[in-house]
Amino acid sequence: LHPVVKDENDQRKDVDEVFEALKYLSKDNQIIITYPNFDPGYQYIINKIIDIKKKIKDIKVVKHLGGTNYHSLLHYIGKNKKGFCMGNSSSGIKETIFFNCPTLNIGDRQNSRLKPKNVVDVKANKNQIISKINKLNNHKVYENPYKLSGKFNKIPDEIVKKFFRNDFKFKKCTI
């Protein structure tokens, strides 16, 4: 969960609602929490993470998973058809679809983004978060709006051929 630039009291209320939902969800789910980015308001979220970890020992807290561990976790969730991603990060919108990982997008931080159908939007409200979790556990395979096909996949290769030497090494990347 990342801070959202808005009124500090509203932001704290939203964060409190999310952490109340996490407390409830921890009864039946293994929870891994990562630290927020460093936007204004991050320290309040970190304090909530520390507090929930003290109260619920089974919750795992990781300051930063890193790309490989994060993508491995998404892959595990998608492959085993157990679990989901929850938060307000753009990675939940753009990356989880590649791993068939259901995602609960909390709040309005990602409102302007194109969202695949594995993403379910919800307000930062404990009861709404809990009720929307049931919609996530279907693990259907959805069309990926971010996947390029046909001639679009050739664009990077064509750029390299036109502007670089023949011995230039083009590294294929994934998100």
Residue positions per predicted region:
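Nucleotide-activated sugar donor-binding and catalytic core shared by glycosyltransferases
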Residues: 1-175
